[in-house]
Regions:
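Non-heme Fe(II)/2-oxoglutarate
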Residues: 1-18
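Conserved metal-binding segment of the jelly-roll/cupin
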Residues: 60-62, 78, 87, 93-114, ...
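Histidine-centered divalent metal-coordination motifs
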Residues: 68-70, 108
Length: 161
């Protein structure tokens, strides 16, 4: 197996891409996010580490990411902003520095009720699930998807490398 070396993604370097990201309008349950990929991970299993996805999600004041769910867990760390998430009916109020988890297949949605951009870092096991061909999601509610072929594309192709 290939050796996976440590990686760092500097916020200063990502800031211009986050600025481009927030110019992209939200559609349906869509989200604006950047994928942080370690170049040492295999091309057919790209992620921060094998099987682990690391991303940055940004949404503007007043925006709402519609209810959705997936069979990968999600750990969210709030880097900026204030708001709340509804996870399986439970309201989780968050602000800068907070961390919360969303279990696999838990219905969840996010709200930015603050006055500034909300930035969430999130970790998921979706890369491993996609590699195993068992990644599933439901978004918007009632519309199922299933990852049957490998490969990942950036949310906005202009943000990709």
């Amino acid at each position: 197996p290939k050796t996976i070396l440590p990686s760092i993604w500097r916020f200063k370097a990502m800031q211009p891409k986050i600025d481009m990201l927030i110019a992209d309008p939200l559609k349906r349950a869509d989200r604006r996010f950047l994928s942080l990929v370690n170049g040492d991970t295999p091309k057919d299993n790209p992620g921060a580490l094998p099987g682990i996805f690391l991303g940055i999600q940004a949404f503007k004041s007043g925006e709402h990411i519609l209810p959705h769910r997936h069979n990968s867990f999600a750990i969210y760390h709030i880097m900026q902003g204030t708001g709340y998430s509804i996870v399986e009916g439970e309201r989780i109020t968050w602000e800068r520095g907070d961390t919360f988890v969303c279990p696999a297949w838990a219905m969840h949605e996010h709200f930015n009720d603050g006055t500034e951009l909300a930035i969430q870092y999130f970790v998921q096991d979706m890369v491993g699930r996609a590699y195993e061909r068992n990644l599933m999601w439901e978004e918007p509610v009632g519309h199922f998807g299933h990852m049957v072929k490998g490969g990942f594309r950036p949310h906005n192709p202009e943000l990709g490398d």
